[in-house]
Amino acid sequence: MVNSVVFFDITVDGKPLGRISIKLFADKIPKTAENFRALSTGEKGFRYKGSCFHRIIPGFMCQGGDFTRPNGTDDKSIYGEKFDDENLIRKHTGSGILSMVNAGPNTNGSQLFICTAKTEWLDGKHVAFGKVKERVNIVEAMEHFGYRNSKTSKKITIADCGQF
């Protein structure tokens, strides 16, 4: 299986911040990687484009991917509402690791987070399935708009997304 590369064009209050590219680990985690890839391209009729990063905690992560509600209270995958944890072997080794948000075992949907630090306490609990390949500095810049209480000071949006 090919490890696809997707991109997110990020804006802050409508102003361009930059483009990040993300390599997906489809060779080891194919179902999760395919969900993310298809949500990035929009080929199933719904996508990440226009959704926001609603939760940012400096020194931890940036969370987004709720394209049905902008507040993180919903989740939808290309497989239906939720899908099972596929492979928990990848570790949360540091900044740029892409992982699934969940509400417990086997509750993956569309929400994701990008680590901004090593988060080993998430190993074995959240599916890590990709890594920022280029422009991790954009993710680090997003951190500046977050607070310890997870609120954001500005609207951080995925203005466009797709596959290279």
Curated annotation (Swiss-Prot):
It comes from the Eukaryota. GO terms for molecular function: cyclosporin A binding; peptidyl-prolyl cis-trans isomerase activity. It holds the Pfam family Pro_isomerase. InterPro entries: Cyclophilin-like_dom_sf, Cyclophilin-type_PPIase, Cyclophilin-type_PPIase_CS, Cyclophilin-type_PPIase_dom. Its EC number is 5.2.1.8. One of its GO terms (cellular component) is cytoplasm. GO terms for biological process: protein folding. Coiled coil: none annotated. Residues 7-163 form the PPIase cyclophilin-type domain. SUPFAM superfamilies: Cyclophilin-like. Keywords: Cytoplasm, Glycoprotein, Isomerase, Rotamase. Glycans are attached at residues 71, 108. Gene3D superfamilies: Cyclophilin-like. Belongs to the cyclophilin-type PPIase family. PPIase A subfamily. It is one of six related genes or pseudogenes found in a cluster, thought to result from gene duplication, on chromosome 1. PPIases accelerate the folding of proteins. It catalyzes the cis-trans isomerization of proline imidic peptide bonds in oligopeptides. This is Peptidyl-prolyl cis-trans isomerase A-like 4H.
